[in-house]
Amino acid sequence: MAKKCVVVRNEKRKQIVEKYASKREELKKQGDYEALRKLPRDSSPTRLKNRCSITGRAKGVYKKFGLCRHILRKYALEGKIPGMKKASW
C-alpha cells in the first residue's frame, strides 16, 4: 500500500491539471511557449501517475477499472465487478 501523502499528492495534481487544461491548450495553439513555461509544473498531464483507487499502488493498474491487479482479482472473485468472472476453458 502506498503512503497516503503520495496518493494525496497525485489527487492534488489531478485537480491542478483539470484547472489549467483549457489555458494550456490555448497557449499551445498560440505557440506561446514562454507563457506555458510559467504555468505550474504540476499542471502538465505527464506528471500524473495512474494509481489504484483502493490501495494507491502505481504498478499493475488497469485503466478501465482504476484498480491494481490484486484488488481487481479479489473483487472479481467476490463478484463485485459486474460481468467479470474467472476464465475456464
UniProtKB/Swiss-Prot annotation:
Keyword Glycosyltransferase set for record = no
Organism equals: Chloroherpeton thalassium (strain ATCC 35110 / GB-78)
Which PROSITE patterns does the record associate with it?
RIBOSOMAL_S14
GO cellular component terms, alphabetically, are:
cytoplasm; small ribosomal subunit
Q: InterPro entries recorded for this chain?
A: Ribosomal_uS14, Ribosomal_uS14_bac/plastid, Ribosomal_uS14_CS, Ribosomal_uS14_sf
Q: What is this protein called?
A: Small ribosomal subunit protein uS14
What's its job?
A: Binds 16S rRNA, required for the assembly of 30S particles and may also be responsible for determining the conformation of the 16S rRNA at the A site.
Keywords of the record: Ribonucleoprotein, Ribosomal protein, RNA-binding, rRNA-binding
Q: Is Transferase one of the keywords UniProt gives this record?
A: no
| Gene Ontology process terms (BP) | translation
Oligomeric state and interaction partners are given as:
Part of the 30S ribosomal subunit. Contacts proteins S3 and S10.
> Which molecular function terms from Gene Ontology are attached?
rRNA binding; structural constituent of ribosome
Q: Which family, according to UniProt?
A: Belongs to the universal ribosomal protein uS14 family.
